[in-house]
């Protein structure tokens, strides 16, 4: 499957919400409504031995069922109306207790031998909402259930849609996101960042041209 190197339109920190046009990322414990960017988990995954890894998404009928299937690099969350087991593992991995296999997203480029953390978010954005210009401390990927997003980077633009190719962005490059189309965007998002680096940070060294506004 072809992979689009794209990113989510949210700057998130586990301890401090970051301001942006259209909203901020908050811990899910502070949730007051549906729309927004909500940090649902932020956990260490340990040292990654290889230069690439994969994000595995499995759904289960109950939290207990998902927990029974969880491996050492798995996280159980409730988001977007389902119970999820989200795992960082090699290509082709499957949990010990079978659930509904939803997606296997990757490869995610990482630095072999480095320690990593996984930050997971539930994102619900209305068309027209945008991000601040930002970058990540490791690869980012998302699983989109609905909606459309336009990414602008120094290299141009890309469009990510529900039902399309896997969307991933490597750590480092600056980016600016706009929720486009007519449908509310609903997605699960992963930032797999080096433990010594922040998940996200503002990027002041590049200014977007607004290429997504005309789409």
Locate predicted features.
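N-terminal accessory interaction module
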Residues: 23-97
């Amino acid at each position: 499957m072809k992979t689009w190197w794209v990113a989510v339109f949210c700057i998130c920190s586990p301890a401090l919400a970051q301001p942006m046009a259209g909203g901020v990322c908050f811990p899910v414990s502070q949730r007051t409504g549906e729309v927004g960017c909500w940090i649902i988990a932020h956990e260490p995954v340990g040292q990654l031995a290889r230069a690439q890894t994969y994000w595995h998404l499995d759904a289960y009928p109950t939290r207990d069922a998902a927990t029974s299937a969880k491996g050492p690099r798995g996280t159980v969350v409730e988001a977007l109306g389902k119970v999820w087991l989200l795992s960082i593992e090699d290509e082709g991995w499957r949990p010990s207790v079978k659930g509904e296999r939803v997606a296997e997203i990757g490869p995610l480029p990482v630095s072999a031998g480095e320690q990593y953390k996984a930050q997971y978010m539930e994102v619900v954005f209305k068309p027209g909402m945008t991000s601040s210009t930002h970058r990540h401390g490791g690869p980012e990927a998302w699983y989109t259930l609905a909606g459309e997003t336009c990414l602008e980077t120094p290299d141009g633009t890309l469009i990510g849609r529900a039902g399309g190719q896997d969307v991933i962005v490597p750590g480092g490059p600056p980016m600016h996101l706009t929720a486009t189309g007519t449908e509310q965007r609903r997605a699960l998002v992963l930032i797999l960042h080096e433990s010594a680096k922040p998940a996200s940070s503002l990027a002041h060294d590049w200014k977007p041209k607004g290429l997504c506004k005309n789409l």
